[in-house]
UniProtKB/Swiss-Prot annotation:
Biased composition range(s): Basic residues: 542-564
Record bears the keyword Repeat: yes
Disruption phenotype: Embryonic lethality by 11.5 days post coitum (dpc). Before death, embryos are smaller and exhibit abnormalities in the neural tube where the gene is highly expressed. Mice with a hypomorphic allele display severe obesity without type 2 diabetes and are protected from inflammatory diseases.
Subcellular location(s) of the protein: Nucleus; Chromosome
Protein name: Bromodomain-containing protein 2
Higher taxonomy: Eukaryota, Metazoa, Chordata, Craniata, Vertebrata
Sequence positions that bind a protein: 111, 154-156, 159-160
């Protein structure tokens, strides 16, 4: 048909056909096609250009995205396909070939439209969803299936595009499996400014259709401006002849954009159409189809999503804030209770609340949406879900518990979130997409949870809890192999005790809540006891012992120094009120050394024999020492320090198997709470045992290990510290102190100051007795040194 055009007809009738002014404009065979919109001066055809224009191939018109004659709806399934399925597919790395219609001319596929009779792409489906083109979700799903089928039909199975389509189709089917089962039409809520919104919506729909249609027609890449008569009148609202569009586009494309679009969108709403006309200019002036579609597709969703956000707030806000409205309807008592609980939100729980808000935010919605709501096993056809998953968990439940202040600490919050992820890993196969989504979301959670701030210490109201964790943390810092587990146990114990105190203070809680909390606390205590038992039974490394020895040595030196200072103060005390004492000693004429020694114990008595000295010194020594105990009952009830408990635990572990039965018997006899426990599997927590029980255990263990019982006022020397180095150090220290004391005595031996000599010698003897007593549990070398030092002190004073 194109060959019938003769040269003498071209100057007149060619222009007429081109401008749509002659009768040939409507004839399809006489239409002259334009290869590109970028060439200027196309209106003056020549003989050379006519055959090139006539032989250029053409793309068929793209599928319609809006049809006023065909009614559309907004349903829950269509909204799910738009917000979830389309969003996930559109952002996928393999989605780029499917975002716009196949350009057979640009890609050099002349047979594409002969094989594929019904082209489809995701850009068309997306615009149809935005324009409410579909009546039911099945129509949209059919379009998706058509798009994938076209790809499989035209391409070879080994092509990359086929693999990309298969990946997208797999994601599509997985998303559709989570779609609501029953399709329900959503009521479109009209906002307050309904007139403006209605006009804006109508103008928006008109401008969107023209925006997508005009660039689609004008952007058939480098081929021809094909304007089909039945298509344009339905989309461009008030233009009767398609040739009117083509003529200004051909004459001046850059200047014709805004007037054309303003005219086309004028009947629905002129002001908005003008605004859209500005955007249309940017669309039509872009040279390539990809450049046209790329601004077109992001530019249209903001306009189309804006009214949808106003019309359909439940789906937009459902995942973010589902609980806030019911909280306003709570009774006053519950509101007061919640407000009181709100005040007790700790820093760590505030951090957890921020993590929860981030998990529910739009930033992570692409892979977090399966975890927003509880798994509806019946709707999804997962009949074995609740048989496999015994404790379901989801983010809405976590949010509800957080708002109701059901979490007492960050560990409970983290346990629920991790339970949700572990349920997903447990039920789904490892290669499932929802598992990958869970792992991605868990990475976000763990990264934020690792930045948990430390809880500030509260020294005032909890003396027990503040005393215990340092001990536990001390043990964890000393042990190199079991550091992390002991730290976690100490934190859990501290939180448990804080929780117990909170339970006592919150008298308004119901009995059911108390029972529930007590049960949870008992479970946590049981877990902590298991950890402590495992820690106490674990091997202790040698560096730990060395560190302990150094610490013990420092403590012992400090204690001895304090004892010496106390004795010196006691010596200084009696000196002041006795100035006339030297006169009495002069009158007595007892200037010998024996009199000084004998008069020392009684502080002023002149009689007595030397064999009474040990008894008197024993009687007078306890009042000088501040840490002594008067009776055995006080000794039994004296609380154990952390080091003593730890040493007792080590000693019990050293006992042979046949001796452990007696240990269990002692504990069960003295601890009512452990009487009903199984003797074979009893767990000993030294922090909960009475001091009397611990002392009885200590006596029994020492008797089994054949150790000497410690005196009440001495610092307990741990087992395994009888090395020669320590003995030599002690010996040197004792000798040095004795030399100091004897030197002081020798320098102050003058007749008028016998009373001061007596007090100095008494201080010396008390110090010697104290030092020898403190080293009584040491080896023979240290005991012999202490006895020899006491002999030398006696000889010096004699």
């Amino acid at each position: 048909m194109l060959q019938n055009v003769t040269p003498h007809k071209l100057p007149g009738e060619g222009n007429a056909g081109l401008l749509g002014l002659g009768p040939e404009a409507a004839a399809p065979g006489k239409r002259i096609r334009k290869p590109s919109l970028l060439y200027e001066g196309f209106e003056s055809p020549t003989m050379a250009s006519v055959p090139a224009l006539q032989l250029a191939p053409a793309n068929p018109p793209p599928p319609e995205v809006s049809n006023p004659k065909k009614p559309g709806r907004v349903t829950n399934q269509l909204q799910y396909l738009h917000k979830v399925v389309m969003k996930a597919l559109w952002k996928h790395q393999f989605a780029w070939p499917f975002r716009q219609p196949v350009d057979a001319v640009k890609l050099g596929l002349p047979d594409y439209h002969k094989i594929i009779k019904q082209p489809m792409d995701m850009g068309t489906i997306k615009r149809r969803l935005e324009n409410n083109y579909y009546w039911a979700a099945s129509e949209c799903m059919q379009d998706f299936n058509t798009m994938f089928t076209n790809c499989y039909i035209y391409n070879k199975p080994t092509d990359d595009i086929v693999l990309m389509a298969q990946t997208l189709e797999k994601i599509f089917l997985q998303k559709v499996a989570s779609m609501p089962q029953e399709e329900q039409e959503l009521v479109v809520t009209i906002p307050k400014n309904s007139h403006k919104k209605g006009a804006k919506l109508a103008a928006l729909q008109g401008s969107i259709t023209s925006a997508h249609q005009v660039p689609a027609v004008s952007s058939v890449s480098h081929t021809a401006l094909y304007t089909p008569p039945p298509e344009i009148p339905t989309t461009v609202l008030n233009i009767p002849h398609p040739s009117v569009i083509s003529s200004p586009l051909l004459k001046s494309l850059h200047s014709a954009g805004p007037p054309l679009l303003a005219v086309s969108a004028a009947p629905p709403a002129q002001p908005l159409a003008k605004k859209k006309g500005v955007k249309r200019k940017a669309d039509t002036t872009t040279p390539t189809p990809t450049a046209i579609l790329a601004p077109g597709s992001p530019a249209s969703p903001p306009g189309s999503l804006e009214p949808k956000a106003a019309r359909l707030p439940p789906m937009r806000r459902e995942s973010g804030r589902p609980i806030k409205p019911p909280r306003k309807d709570l009774p006053d008592s519950q509101q007061q209770h919640q407000s009181s609980k709100k005040g007790k939100l700790s820093e760590q729980l505030k951090h957890c609340n921020g993590i929860l808000k981030e998990l529910l935010s739009k930033k992570h919605a692409a892979y977090a949406w399966p975890f927003y709501k509880p798994v509806d096993a019946s709707a999804l056809g997962l009949h074995d879900y609740h048989d496999i998953i015994k404790h379901p968990m989801d983010l809405s439940t976590v949010k509800r518990k957080m708002e109701n202040r059901d979490y007492r600490d960050a560990q409970e919050f983290a346990a629920d979130v991790r339970l949700m992820f572990s349920n997903c890993y447990k039920y789904n196969p490892p290669d499932h997409d929802v598992v990958a989504m869970a792992r991605k979301l868990q990475d976000v959670f763990e990264f934020r949870y690792a930045k948990m701030p430390d809880e500030p210490l509260e020294p005032g109201p909890l003396p027990v809890s503040t005393a215990l964790p340092p001990g536990l943390t001390k043990s964890s810092s000393e042990s190199s192999s079991e550091e992390s587990s002991s730290e976690s146990s100490s934190e859990e114990e501290e939180e448990e005790e804080e929780d117990e105190d909170e339970e006592e203070s919150e008298s308004s809680d119901s009995e059911e809540e108390r029972a529930h909390r007590l049960a949870e606390l008992q479970e946590q205590l049981r877990a902590v006891h298991e950890q402590l038992a495992a820690l106490s039974q674990g091997p202790i490394s040698k560096p730990k012992r060395k560190r302990e020895k150094k610490e013990k040595k420092k403590k012992r030196k400090a204690e001895k120094h304090r004892g010496r200072i106390g004795i010196d103060e006691d010596d200084k005390g009696p000196r002041a009120p006795r100035p006339p004492q030297p006169k009495k000693s002069k009158k007595a004429g007892g200037g010998g050394s024996n009199a000084t020694t004998l008069s020392h114990p009684g502080f002023g008595t002149s009689g007595g024999s030397s064999n009474k000295l040990p008894k008197k010194s024993q009687k007078t020594a306890p009042p000088v020492l501040p840490t002594g105990y008067d009776s055995e009952e006080e000794e039994e009830s004296r609380p154990m320090s952390y080091d003593e408990k730890r040493q007792l635990s080590l000693d019990i572990n050293k006992l042979p198997g046949e001796k452990l039965g007696r240990v269990v018997h002692i504990i069960q006899a003295r601890e009512p709470s452990l009487r009903d426990s199984n003797p074979e599997e009893i767990e000993i927590d030294f922090e909960t045992l009475k001091p009397s029980t611990l002392r009885e255990l200590e006596r029994y263990v020492l008797s089994c290990l054949r150790k000497k019982p410690r005196k009440p006022y001495t610092i307990r020397k741990p087992v395994g510290k009888t090395k020669e180095e320590l003995a030599l150090e002690k010996k040197r220290e004792l000798e040095k102190r004795l030399q100091d004391v004897s030197g002081q005595l020798n320098s102050t031996k003058k007749p008028p100051k016998k009373a001061s000599e007596k007090t100095e010698s008494s201080a010396q003897q008390v110090a010697v007795s104290r030092l020898s007593a403190s080293s009584s549990s040491s080896d023979s070398s240290s005991s012999s040194s202490s006895s020899s030092s006491s002999d030398t002190s006696d000889s010096d004073s004699g």
